[in-house]
Amino acid sequence: MKKKIGLLVMAYGTPYKEEDIERYYTHIRRGRKPSPEMLEDLTERYRAIGGISPLATITLEQAKKLEKRLNEVQDEVEYHMYLGLKHIEPFIEDAVKEMHNDGIQDAIALVLAPHYSTFSVKSYVGRAQEEAEKLGNLTIHGIDSWYKEPKFIQYWVDAVKGIYSGMSDAEREKAVLIVSAHSLPEKIIAMGDPYPDQLNETADYIARGAEVANYAVGWQSAGNTPDPWIGPDVQDLTRELNEKYGYTSFVYAPVGFVAEHLEVLYDNDFECKVVTDEIGAKYYRPEMPNASDAFIDCLTDVVVKKKESVM
């Protein structure tokens, strides 16, 4: 009989329906309810992208396809997928409990975020491992980052090339690529968090692969807290690049995200587009990886490499 291996796929989570927004936001705020104004603001953002984010559906599809692919590409072990979310059910701890109940003793934990940070990957994997230790007889092997994975870089190289190939030579000369990820509080830099460096590296790899000379790194979707967050914000960066260099076409690659969701559909497709419209520039944003075969192949390689290194 083949050994069963747990595949713990972890992600941020998103409200499933409008009624979930308040409890979801309260969980993000560590139990503090949002003010009516804050709740209204977030609800309006969801309404602007069609009422609710497609993220829940995409995350589940990514996880199921990954499980299927892993069981197709090898015959030594049988992967069983469990989904664990940070801010809404099924919570990470629930997924680990279910895994334990199913008699799983070894699991590979993959966070659907390519870059490592203490705020994201470390906290997800930490929660999973803590729960596994409490339950006993279950080892969780966490994957730190996978932004250097050749198929991940290639996905974005192809996506960016696809946009540039549709431009005339004249437009291409005045175009700039903005590579971005979710901003985090600036204090992580003082703590030696590798997150900003990893995004810079990712941008270099993609620009080199897509043969794009004009590119910059930006940050987006900063939280509403008194702490300073890493910048420049993509909207400010857009204005600055237009003023300084006269760019008139902006290509946004939000590579810190793996799916279409609020941060991309609103913060990029709405907020950044407001800026490009204002300055009379063109707005482009490649398709997100979502559950595309190319992206699932990339994640398959990531999991297989981890499994081979620890088992």
Curated annotation (Swiss-Prot):
PROSITE patterns documented for this protein: FERROCHELATASE (PS00534)
Protein's name according to its UniProt entry: Coproporphyrin III ferrochelatase 1
A molecular-function term among this protein's GO annotations: ferrochelatase activity
Species in which this protein is naturally found: Bacillus thuringiensis subsp. konkukian (strain 97-27)
Keywords on record: Cytoplasm, Heme biosynthesis, Iron, Lyase, Metal-binding, Porphyrin biosynthesis
Family statement drawn from the similarity comment of this UniProt entry: Belongs to the ferrochelatase family.
Gene coding for it: cpfC1
Any Gene Ontology CC annotation: cytoplasm
EC number: 4.99.1.9
Positions of Fe-coproporphyrin III binding: Y12, R29, R45, Y46, S53, Y124
Lineage top rank: taxon: Bacteria
